[in-house]
């Protein structure tokens, strides 16, 4: 059965095209700096928002029109697989991602849940044999079911800890079987509402124990994918332990886990933490911890995770600027952890949304590449910090200066003169590059 019968393979038609079902900027085979766009961007479709999301919110029931929703139970799960690979093929995306409960319904017992998962994984495995689309990452949902009300690895109930471990064990086995590039840990319930009833030390210790067990089991079964932590400060939990990259990095270092993990950074989670997307990418990058990206955007006027498709070209450009300086994402990718708006309820809206996101990151890639090629910001930064390449600044950097020497130097100083940060000039340059690249004539790559 065709679930999108009126939509064919999405072509690249260039920036002058007015076809809503065509890419204007994303040309998978176009080379940018020696690699194709497809190799740079490594796009991925999120199974949960795209195939299980129904548009419901706290004020209204689901309203999405989805042809596969005429089914229920395991028949619905199978229909979603069919619809998924049809969409993957028509968008020509190289990757997808899922939580365990996205692909198969939970049973009355853990054994029944395993049975359901095995049946759907069999089906996915068959589709993957003839599809270019591979598994970027999978994960276990450890936050939706009432059993996880107090957390999973940080639950006050050891039975819940054990159940969560069983789900992750199964998830790692699925990851190995389907050839996942990564495995993600997102602690939506790993945190607390109040310290009045919380043993924070025990919870953090247990979270570390849980992650060490996961590392050990991955080695035991021969799964060599990259482990990823996805930081988020809040929602659904008031205070989550993986608040942001800096917080999660400190946790990994404290518990001897840093060498086993990198970060999966989501734009909207950065917004909730009070950071820009590029800030979180930069912190991860300079510590060698940038692993993958959940590509979306938030609404700064709203205080929750809106998971909008990314269309802000400043953000996609500055994100790709960090990713290119990182040497790419390695085994990671750009996963669209994004959902169409409640008012965009027709099946074709799924295509319009992904086209918008893919085009936006294609522009960001080309602008970032040209900025780096022309060393626009690098030249300015080098000049700004020039005082640390000579004289007393060089001694500071090389570790040969101490407080006594610095005091002696400072006592001899006259007036200290600073130079302008030129922020407005730099923003003008960024605008100029964006306009040049996004215009039809801006095709240099």
Curated annotation (Swiss-Prot):
Isomerase as UniProt keyword: yes
Catalytic activity: alpha-D-xylose = alpha-D-xylulofuranose
UniProt keyword Lipid biosynthesis, yes or no: no
Single Gene Ontology MF annotation: magnesium ion binding
Major localisation: cytoplasm
UniProt-listed GO biological process terms: D-xylose metabolic process
Record: residues binding Mg(2+) 2: 266, 269, 305, 307
Localization, UniProt: Cytoplasm
Alphabetized PROSITE patterns for the sequence: XYLOSE_ISOMERASE
Enzyme Commission code: 5.3.1.5
PANTHER family per record: PTHR48408, XYLOSE ISOMERASE
Protein family according to the UniProt entry: Belongs to the xylose isomerase family.
Protein name: Xylose isomerase
Biological source species: Geobacillus kaustophilus (strain HTA426)
GN (gene name): xylA
């Amino acid at each position: 059965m065709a679930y999108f019968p009126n939509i064919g393979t999405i072509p690249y038609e260039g920036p002058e095209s007015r076809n809503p079902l065509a890419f204007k900027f994303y040309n998978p085979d176009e080379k940018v700096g020696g690699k194709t766009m497809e190799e740079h961007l490594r796009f991925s479709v999120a199974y949960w928002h795209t195939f299980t999301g129904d548009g419901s919110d706290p004020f209204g029931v689901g309203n999405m029109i989805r042809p596969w929703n005429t089914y229920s139970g395991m028949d619905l799960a199978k229909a979603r697989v069919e619809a998924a690979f049809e969409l993957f093929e028509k968008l020509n995306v190289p990757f997808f991602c899922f939580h365990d409960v996205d692909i198969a319904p939970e049973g009355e017992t853990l054994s029944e849940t395993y049975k359901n998962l095995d049946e759907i994984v069999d089906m996915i495995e068959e589709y993957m044999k003839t599809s270019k689309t591979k598994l970027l990452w999978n994960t276990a949902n450890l936050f939706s079911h009432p059993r996880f009300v107090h957390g999973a690895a940080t639950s006050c109930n050891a039975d819940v800890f054990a159940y969560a471990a069983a789900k992750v064990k199964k998830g790692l086995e699925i990851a190995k079987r389907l050839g996942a590039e990564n495995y993600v840990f997102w602690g939506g319930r790993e945190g607390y509402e109040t310290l009045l009833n919380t043993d924070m030390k025990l919870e953090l210790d247990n979270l570390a124990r849980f992650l060490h067990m996961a590392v050990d089991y991955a080695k035991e079964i021969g799964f060599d994918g990259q482990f990823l932590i996805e930081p988020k400060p809040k929602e659904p939990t008031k205070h989550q332990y993986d608040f942001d990259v800096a917080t999660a990095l400190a946790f990994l270092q404290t518990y001897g886990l840093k060498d086993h993990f990198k970060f999966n950074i989501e734009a909207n989670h950065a917004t909730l933490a009070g950071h820009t997307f590029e800030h979180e990418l930069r912190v991860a990058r300079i510590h060698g911890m940038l692993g993958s990206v959940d590509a979306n955007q938030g609404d700064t006027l709203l205080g929750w995770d809106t998971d909008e498709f990314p269309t802000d070209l400043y953000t996609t450009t500055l994100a790709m600027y960090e990713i290119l300086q990182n040497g790419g994402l390695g085994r990671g990718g750009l996963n669209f952890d994004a959902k169409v708006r409640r008012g965009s309820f027709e099946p074709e809206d799924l295509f319009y949304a992904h086209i918008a996101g893919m085009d936006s990151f294609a522009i960001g890639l080309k602008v970032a590449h040209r900025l780096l090629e022309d060393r626009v910001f690098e030249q300015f930064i080098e000049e700004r910090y020039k005082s640390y390449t000579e004289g007393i600044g060089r001694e500071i950097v090389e570790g040969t200066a101490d407080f006594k020497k610095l005091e002696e130097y400072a006592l001899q100083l006259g007036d200290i003169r600073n130079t302008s940060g030129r922020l407005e000039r730099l923003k003008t340059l960024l605008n100029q590059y964006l306009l040049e690249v996004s215009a039809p004539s801006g095709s240099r790559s």
